[in-house]
């Protein structure tokens, strides 16, 4: 299954001094970017990148279990400083297959109402 991961810097994690900013970039941002690149090369991250104009990441991962999601997301150095949401994704064909029976029921109700 595929998941959309959205990570945004928590307000409490914002640097307040230039020295904190340097430390944050060196110890959290660069290592996270390097690890995301590696995970992309390993095809654990399927697509994604940094958010333009914001301090955040958005990417799609494939995982068979919640444990895999936790390993990837919590393994990112920047994770403790981020507000993170993980959304399960359904494929286009799976969604269409789920909707077909409901559509047929609606059609049956519509044709029955016109009698």
What are these regions (language model features)?
Residues 1-115:
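Conserved, structured core segments of small domains
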């Amino acid at each position: 299954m595929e998941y959309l991961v959205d990570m945004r810097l928590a307000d409490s994690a914002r640097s307040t001094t230039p020295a904190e900013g340097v430390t944050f970039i060196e110890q959290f941002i660069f290592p996270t970017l390097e690890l995301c690149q590696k995970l992309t090369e390993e095809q654990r991250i399927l697509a994604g990148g940094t958010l333009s104009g914001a301090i955040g990441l958005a990417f799609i991962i494939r995982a068979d279990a919640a444990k895999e999601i936790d390993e990837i997301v919590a393994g990112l150095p920047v994770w403790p400083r981020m507000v993170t949401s993980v959304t399960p994704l359904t494929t286009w064909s799976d969604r269409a297959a789920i909707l077909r029976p409901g559509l047929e029921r609606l059609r049956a109700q519509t044709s029955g109402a016109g009698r």
